[in-house]
Amino acid sequence: MSYPADDYESEAAYDPYAYPGDYDMHTGDPKQDLAYERQYEQQTYQVIPEVIKNFIQYFHKTVSDLIDQKVYELQASRVSSDVIDQKVYEIQDIYENSWTKLTERFFKNTPWPEAEAIAPQVGNDAVFLILYKELYYRHIYAKVSGGPSLEQRFESYYNYCNLFNYILNADGPAPLELPNQWLWDIIDEFIYQFQSFSQYRCKTAKKSEGEMDFLRSNPKVWNVHSVLNVLHSLVDKSNINRQLEVYTSGGDPESVAGEYGRHSLYKMLGYFSLVGLLRLHSLLGDYYQAIKVLENIELNKKSMYSRVPECQVTTYYYVGFAYLMMRRYQDAIRVFANILLYIQRTKSMFQRTTYKYEMINKQNEQMHALLAIALTMYPMRIDESIHLQLREKYGDKMLRMQKGDPQVYEELFSYACPKFLSPVVPNYDNVHPNYHKEPFLQQLKVFSDEVQQQAQLSTIRSFLKLYTTMPVAKLAGFLDLTEQEFRIQLLVFKHKMKNLVWTSGISALDGEFQSASEVDFYIDKDMIHIADTKVARRYGDFFIRQIHKFEELNRTLKKMGQRP
């Protein structure tokens, strides 16, 4: 699906001051107006601690120095330099360490100073203020009790428009570089705030008439088309799909990067936008399109682009979930098992930063639940350490699911699925109380229908494992089914155990039909003939692989020892 560039421009060109001013926010109720004015005065004239002033000035100087250096590099037709890399590293330290520590100390549950309050200290630097506001509103969404007001949701949207406008509509590459972690967080937060607003606007019960009028008169703010257009524009500007295509075929991505894609800012925003599109299409329930946007990303191979752990985890979570909903259980199990093993081995790395740990830990728990569902519906062998974790966490629930308990399926699905949303602006004159739950209930129904179709398969599988031949009528009697009903269930078993499975190639949509079922059968007249297809584990191959790895490591160490 393509989105015209002029659509994006019309959305992105919003004037940040175009929304109603202070007077328009008055309600006519003296008590409410007085409370609003007190809050406004409190925000405008708050005293900024000296340490925060010094930090903001240092932050501004670091960003300004980087921009000045980037301007010089662009004029000299250079992509980057050691000076730029050093400045990006300094900004990363500010972003990941200083900002977090000061937030914890001064603004744990309250907002940072407004951009207007710090503007004089940074010389009203427009670019820095946009970046500052991005952090400011993100903090309000994450930590401030009560969350963002309607006005703050709109202001944050306009600020993102200004940021993407600066990056996408400049005459030539924008003179800016940011750490990969911050670039990922920008895309991640942009989609999160859209998701949050989509659910917020559907909950009309506690909204005043003024807020309802405000929502009615601004249907294009946080509109799904503007969000999609931003992501597609970043993908197109960076030429990231062509770069990935060349990279995966062993070529040099720089050769096809183009004027913008050569720069880290555009390249990484383009890559992260692909993951953003994966997430957005999954939230909208379009799983085929979700995986299709990643057709040039080889998931089963380490990449130079996968340097941000949260991006890796998010990618695998949404790809795995999309596979699950597309009934590609074997692929879903492979994806979940791979990323859970990765998290298991690198967990200590995330514990250094609390906010990263919380996010990754939550998705880790959700993926365990989804893996439990997938393995119940499609039993197959997985890594022993992951299987052990799964038995500890969900052993009891997996047994109940195997017995066909729909309540457990629903419970785990509700806990582990994404927060689905509707792209359509609701009819504010007639919104029923549970309107915001409709996208979730629709996806739950699709999933529950699939579970219902497979309700008998676990029992049939356990009976088939006991015999090699058996009259169809006799086995039907064991299951309290008529012969005709049993034959239908056997056909369902054959159909559901056959999956489209990825075997090779770059696109995650590629695959061939396979069955990983441990039993197979055929019917000859009135007799069912059963074969155990379970392959005994070949330990010899495992040890041979480990010996080869050890020998390769030994050779590498010897070469390192020979260096002067």
From Swiss-Prot:
It is found in: Cytoplasm. Its main location: cytoplasm. The keyword Protein biosynthesis applies. Residues 331-537 form the PCI domain. GO terms for cellular component: eukaryotic 43S preinitiation complex; eukaryotic 48S preinitiation complex; eukaryotic translation initiation factor 3 complex; fibrillar center; nucleolus; nucleoplasm; synapse. One of its GO terms (molecular function) is translation initiation factor activity. The keyword Mitochondrion does not apply. It comes from the Eukaryota. GO terms for biological process: formation of cytoplasmic translation initiation complex; translational initiation; viral translational termination-reinitiation. Component of the eukaryotic translation initiation factor 3 (eIF-3) complex, which is composed of 13 subunits: EIF3A, EIF3B, EIF3C, EIF3D, EIF3E, EIF3F, EIF3G, EIF3H, EIF3I, EIF3J, EIF3K, EIF3L and EIF3M. The eIF-3 complex appears to include 3 stable modules: module A is composed of EIF3A, EIF3B, EIF3G and EIF3I; module B is composed of EIF3F, EIF3H, and EIF3M; and module C is composed of EIF3C, EIF3D, EIF3E, EIF3K and EIF3L. EIF3C of module C binds EIF3B of module A and EIF3H of module B, thereby linking the three modules. EIF3J is a labile subunit that binds to the eIF-3 complex via EIF3B. Component of the eukaryotic translation initiation factor 3 (eIF-3) complex, which is required for several steps in the initiation of protein synthesis. The eIF-3 complex associates with the 40S ribosome and facilitates the recruitment of eIF-1, eIF-1A, eIF-2:GTP:methionyl-tRNAi and eIF-5 to form the 43S pre-initiation complex (43S PIC). The eIF-3 complex stimulates mRNA recruitment to the 43S PIC and scanning of the mRNA for AUG recognition. This is Eukaryotic translation initiation factor 3 subunit L. It comes from Mus musculus. The gene is Eif3l.
